[in-house]
């Protein structure tokens, strides 16, 4: 198992007496692609800035390779940062932009040339050394910003919503490129985003944050398929969340009937919440379904139809490849492996 390169221990941060981070604890492994995911104001960027040395924690420790670095300035940390605003120098060539940090460190010129060429190859911009920044597209400028950060050979790269300014097509392409770069280089990437698709596409581990606290951490599959609470379930993709009762291990009561499930470990007859993803509800003939409802709306989304099906006083969001006309009475089946049980937390 890979060892930790960074440990965040009980990090608390407040601004003007208002808590922004509430005793965050997080271990980040070597060569891991970790994403801090959450809505605006959740504390993800503050966490990143504390790691980079741009903000001080009010309390707590940041450990890098076994040593506390709270008082180490940014330029002495083996950590580099790429921001959404690329901060490239328009009066310099691409070569000069990438080489800027190496020149400051007085690295020998032959080494600078070798390292810059290696970075240009990595970001698929070989032969661009003498071009101006203004001649590049947004996606190419972002690649240069990444190359400039990586040429210093950091052990950790911090990325603060670096793809936010790109259009959808470029963003999708850069997601694949970033993951490829990270694997080739074998260094740790810590990525901040509010975009669930980005997090699910690129990450080895996702840390979901809200209101200065970690709500859940795990693999993309764990986060999507086994959300820990209603916030995570709603934030990571669309969800149907309903109240229910866990009758016993592998048996749950919701929507007026009993369903087999794969969860266990709850108290008998414990109040719980059930999560069912829209794509996990199967539309069938009304006399063949576990539940029955009326199609209230239907929208074609390209790869599926998105429907609202009203069952008694409850509305279900359903994604199906089968078209059902509005007003049609349909059956709905939900299989045990598609029912996810969460502890019920009072508001």
UniProtKB/Swiss-Prot annotation:
Name recorded for this polypeptide: Spermidine/putrescine import ATP-binding protein PotA
Subcellular location as annotated: Cell membrane
Function, in words: Part of the ABC transporter complex PotABCD involved in spermidine/putrescine import. Responsible for energy coupling to the transport system.
Alphabetized UniProt keyword annotations: ATP-binding, Cell membrane, Membrane, Nucleotide-binding, Translocase, Transport
Topological type in the membrane: Peripheral membrane protein
Catalytic activity: ATP + H2O + polyamine-[polyamine-binding protein]Side 1 = ADP + phosphate + polyamineSide 2 + [polyamine-binding protein]Side 1
PANTHER family noted in UniProt: SPERMIDINE/PUTRESCINE IMPORT ATP-BINDING PROTEIN POTA, SPERMIDINE_PUTRESCINE IMPORT ATP-BINDING PROTEIN POTA
InterPro entries in the cross-refs: AAA+_ATPase (IPR003593), ABC_SmlMolc_Importer (IPR050093), ABC_transporter-like_ATP-bd (IPR003439), ABC_transporter-like_CS (IPR017871), Mo/tungstate-bd_C_term_dom (IPR008995), P-loop_NTPase (IPR027417), PotA-like (IPR005893), PotA_ATP-bd (IPR017879)
ABC transporter domain mapped to chain residues: 6-236
Main localisation: membrane
Molecular function per GO: ABC-type putrescine transporter activity; ATP binding; ATP hydrolysis activity
Subunit note: The complex is composed of two ATP-binding proteins (PotA), two transmembrane proteins (PotB and PotC) and a solute-binding protein (PotD).
GO cellular component labels: ATP-binding cassette (ABC) transporter complex
